[in-house]
């Protein structure tokens, strides 16, 4: 409040995760202290009341799993009233963080933040990105700004359009349309409303899917059966990565780069991911692969500790190129 703080330069680096490269801007440690306090004490208390419950990103008690769980609940709610009639609209935005308008953010600060000095801090964080567009990934106030930015669109979908089952995780949206309404008209209205916020919908990634067919949301595949059961399967590419990792772990064990305790943690972390889905067959196949390579079951930690104490290395599996 003494007007001595000015945001410093970010540390820029790229992060490649699952084939997607992202540019990350990390703040200095002295700026992180201000960012964290400002986000928790100012931004979130101001923005949270206008957010819908199904906005599941980076909020306490919510997150990636929350968004998938809410979609499953909405599918069950829809089935009890309409069966498998109707459709689901899946929407994704182009360059969600890099393309957001600074003018829209500053207008929101003007509307909600009454104290001039506090508003100046919020404006200074936005101004760290030149060009009048974009917010940095990796900065906590930026994350809070972008979580709340589509709230006008969210409330338009829920209130003006009267859609009960709708939600999103950051820029990944789902909108469940009853059978008595036109999904193309709903999608057109949503795209127009997003355009008024200067958000661009990626038409190549957005689509309308009948609820009788499977669809993907948040890296998971969903299917509503004829009995109303919601089947959720994990990402198929994750199985390929898991198999490569398990094979690589054997080489690390042989070379002494990995302990059996670390092997227990890593393998069961992989299995736990698929156990959270309706993926029993995939879990079973991964356990069989582990047994073929290491010669013991991955379920019990005693198996790992016993071999770690004996410094044993075993392989009954023939790798194929």
Predicted regions mapped to residue ranges:
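Right-hand nucleic-acid polymerase module
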Residues: 1, 27, 32, 36, ...
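Conserved pre-motif C helix in the palm subdomain of viral-like polymerases
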Residues: 20-52, 131-158
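Active-site-proximal segment of RNA-dependent polymerases
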Residues: 39-101
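A common structural junction motif
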Residues: 113, 191-199
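Short Gly/Ser/Thr- and Asp/Glu-enriched loop/turn motifs at secondary-structure junctions
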Residues: 10, 167-171, 204
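Reverse-transcriptase-like RNA-dependent polymerase core
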Residues: 1-20, 115-128
């Amino acid at each position: 409040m003494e007007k001595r703080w000015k945001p410093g330069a970010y540390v820029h680096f790229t992060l490649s995760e699952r084939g997607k490269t992202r540019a990350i801007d990390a703040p200095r440690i002295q700026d992180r202290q201000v960012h964290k306090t400002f986000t928790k004490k100012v931004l979130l208390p101001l923005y949270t009341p206008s957010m819908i419950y199904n906005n599941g990103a980076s909020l306490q008690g919510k997150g990636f799993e929350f968004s998938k769980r809410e979609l499953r609940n909405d599918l069950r709610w829809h089935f009890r009233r309409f069966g498998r009639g109707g459709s689901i609209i899946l929407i994704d935005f182009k360059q969600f963080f890099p393309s957001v308008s600074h003018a829209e953010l500053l207008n929101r600060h003007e509307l909600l933040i009454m104290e001039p000095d506090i508003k100046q801090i919020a404006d200074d964080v936005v101004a760290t990105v030149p060009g009048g567009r974009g917010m940095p990934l990796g900065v906590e106030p930026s994350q809070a700004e972008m979580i709340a930015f589509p709230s006008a669109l969210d409330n338009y979908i829920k209130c003006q359009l009267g859609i009960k089952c709708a939600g999103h995780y950051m820029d990944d949206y789902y909108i469940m349309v009853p059978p008595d309404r036109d999904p193309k008209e709903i999608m057109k209205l949503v795209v127009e409303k997003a355009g008024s916020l200067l958000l661009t919908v990626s038409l190549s990634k957005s689509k309308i899917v009948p609820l009788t067919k499977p669809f993907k949301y948040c890296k998971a595949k969903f299917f509503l059966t004829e009995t109303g059961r919601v089947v959720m399967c994990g990402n198929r590419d994750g199985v390929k990565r898991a198999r490569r990792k398990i094979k690589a772990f054997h080489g690390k064990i042989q070379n002494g780069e990995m302990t059996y305790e670390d092997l227990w943690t890593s393998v069961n972390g992989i299995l736990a991911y698929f156990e959270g889905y309706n993926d029993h067959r995939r879990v079973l196949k991964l356990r069989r692969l582990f047994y073929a390579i290491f010669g013991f079951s991955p379920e019990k930690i005693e198996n790992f500790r016993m071999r770690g104490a004996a410094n044993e290395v075993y392989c009954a599996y023939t790798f194929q190129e």
